[in-house]
Every structure is written in structure tokens, then in C-alpha cells.
């Protein structure tokens, strides 16, 4: 693939200037000059260009060689497309730029596809016996032999009637011969049985690591519940997928993204193993959508010693986009780091509890400086306002400014204070917000924090007013990979119990679609290639059965994906 991004900002700017000049040439003359293969003409329905602050539509778009060569009137489009063009009548369906994933976990989706799914809608789990039954079914279906690892995903203790975590003792009684690991749906913790603990070298005398949370029973014995840094020893022992499993999981993960209209996906916390496997898959031509990888800060020492590692440019549809730092945990699991205490206390019940940072300010500053010195973009996970303070202090230590255009991204930025928006504006931070929290988790948040604090989570409207470039993400598999739910939640901000949180932060449909297209494209320096329908952009499209701009808010979630097109080629269509 032609590379438009380089590690050096100077080179990136030169590329962008060159393409801006190229596409300033008159459409028809340029299109005829470079005609090399039959074009495709799309027409017959609303085409949302996503250009500008107000709704902007055209009647037709022409694609040739994977790029858009014209967007405008049908008659002119036919002249430019030529007599050999293939015509695609939308039949009233709506076409817009392919969705750009602002943050999710592609590699984790591969694992979920190959593991036991604890949120299977056909087998709902509502108590510990039904959870154990689901694990037994998973073991039998996968024919996992005694002594083998059983990895289950999407574990949610809040759904259990017992109102507690399943424990090591529960799992030992049911599965004495397997190594059991239940990955919490937040991705920030897990529960294991004794066999898995032993494999990870964890005993009851193992101390709690800095930035880690372990739960113990009244006798001081570990319950098998580990969060944040305490979970890493177990994560590191989970065996990798076999080549056959990896290929099947890769195909399934791509299908899930493409079927939801995404032409650009992200692995937001890549290990070295993830990075190597996905780069190899890209080089083998196995990846059909664009995939941005964010290696975690734990990989930094290894990456700095490798001259072959390239950031910012695609290799077979895969690129290393930047380094990911995780400063805190999850507010719904009460592991996010706050300046104010949680009303419900710590996960083990003690008070006062503000959460804890996953790394020190000094460590973050030092490692971020090492990455920044190589020209690598900085991505930071920060949910609580205290963690966001840490991110801002680190950026200031690096001397980052909006003018420098380093575009640090703070993923989640959930419990942001108004004063922190001013710092984001000064530094040039791109906030990757998470509006699904207002639906899935706001009721939990309101039990811990005041209504005004919860009303300011994912403050889209305030961020736009401050001149920022926000995006919206699902953090899948934390919440479903469903862009229409993302759009709806950014417009409605309504919780599961019907409470509206922060009505002044609601977006219009047009603004909400920007958070799924232009916003995330800008955050990864791809605004010259993706996110809009105009000449020079990649022909990345999603086709919807209804127009979000004319669909009532309450019906937004019912909008269906009909087709996903990557660089002019259909990579998924309904009914496949």
C-alpha cells in the first residue's frame, strides 16, 4: 500500500502537501489523465461526505483504483467514470465513509473468538451455577484435555445473583483438573483457580505488586481475583493460539469489524507477540482492513533496541501507530484513579478509596520521553481525573503543544474535569471518548459519584466548543462492537435505567458520525486519507439501510450495516 505517513512530522507534512496539490487539479481532467482501470459509480441514495460542521451530501461518488476520484452530481460522475464503469445503485440506502475505530482490541477479539464467551446471548449467565455450566459446555465443545488451559472472556461479576465474584474455591471445586482463567469484561482483571495461579507462580504469600489489586478472604488467602498489575503474571502464562486457531480467529475478528462497517480497526494494547503475529499476517496478505497497533509501554525496551521497527507507516494494511501507556484502571470496576473517593469504597470494601495509578508519574514521564524522542505518538489510557492529571503533567514535561502537532491521544478521558479541557486545548490532545459508558455503566457510576460528575463523562459538546478533535470508541470487547449504539449513546446519553446523564453534552447525528470518521482519522494522522468522501481519499465506505440524519434518536440503534467497502472492494455484505 502507498504510504502517506512517516515517523517524521516533516516528511508527513510534505506528503500531505503533495497530495493536496495533486487533488486541487480539476476533477475531470485529472480523472481522465490517470485512468487505468474501470471505475465504479455509486449513486441512488444519500451520500454523506462528512465534510464540514453541517450535513453535507452529494448525489454520486466515483471510485477508481481504490480511491475516490469524484464526488458530486450524477451526470458529471458518469462522464468521469466512463462508459466502462460499473454502476452501483444504492436503492435508497445511505453511503458514508467507512468507520474508523478510535479504540478497541482487535487481538483480544481474536482471543474472544477462540475462547469461551461468557456473554453469549443464547446462554445467559446470571449466577455462579450458570457460569460454571457455561464453562463446562465450553470445555466439552473445545475438547480441552485435563491439565489444559480454559480461557473464558467477558466475565461480569455484576450480573451474578450472589452479588460477589466467583472465587478460586468455587472454580477449584468444579474444575480440579483444568487451569481456569476468567477475563473480566473490562480487560482490567481476571479470576483464576489454583491450578492457573500455580502455573503463574502465584502463592498466598505473593505480595501485591505496585499498581495491582488482589482480593483475599478473611484468613488472608487469595481468592483468585486479580486486577490491574496483579493480573499480569497470569496473562503472561496464557498460551498463544496455535497457527490454525490464529488464522481462524483472524478471519473471524476481521468479519466482526467489517460486518459493523469498520474499514480501520485498532489493537489498543498490543503485546510483542500480538505485534509480530499481526505484522506477519499483514505481510502475507491476510488482513483486508487497515489495522493500527498500539504496543504497550511494557514493550518499549524491546522496541527501542530494534532498528527494523517502523512506526507510522503501513506494511500490508498493518501499522504501528504509537506507544500505549495505561495510567489507571476501570471506573466501573473501581480501579480508575480519582481525586475524589468512590462512595462504595475499594473492590474489597475498604474506605476511603480513590483508586491507584498503574505506574508512577516519574516512570510515565521517563518512558514517554523515550518514546517521544523517537517520534512515536503517545497514547494514554486514563479514566479517572487523577490519571488525566498525570497524563497532562507528562505531556507538559515533554513540552508538547498544539502548535507542535504531536497529537497525544488520551483514551477514554472519562471523568474529565472542565479545567482539563483547557489543558487538552493547550497541548493539542485528542480525547478518545467512550459514550457507551453513559448507557452501560452510568448507573454504576452514579452510585459512586455525584450526578454532575457523571453528567460530564465523555464531554463531547464541551470538547468541540474548546476546539478539540474528539473521537468515540467501543473499547470492544468491553462493550459490543456496534457503531450504531456508539452513535445513539452519544446522542441520547441515557443509562440502562433511563436516566439521562449530561444532556448538555449530547451530539447531533452529524456530530456523532464525525466521532466515528473524521475524529479518529485525525487522531492517527490519517485525515488526508480517511474519514470523508472527497477526491483523493481512500474509497472506504459503509452502506446503511437508513440515513442516521433523518432517523429518530430512539431508532438509531436499529440501523443495519448493508455493505462495507475497503479501497473499492467489498469486504463484507449482508447475507454473506
Regions found by a protein language model. Give the residues of each.
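A generic structural signal for residues embedded in beta-strands
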Residues: 70-71, 152, 541-544, 573
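Boundary at the C-terminal end of the N-terminal hydrophobic targeting segment
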Residues: 29-33
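Bacterial N-terminal signal peptides
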Residues: 16-28
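His/Asp/Glu-enriched, well-ordered alpha-helical/loop segment
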Residues: 368-379, 386-408, 412, 418-425, ...
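Divalent metal-binding segments
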Residues: 35-43, 48, 52-306, 321, ...
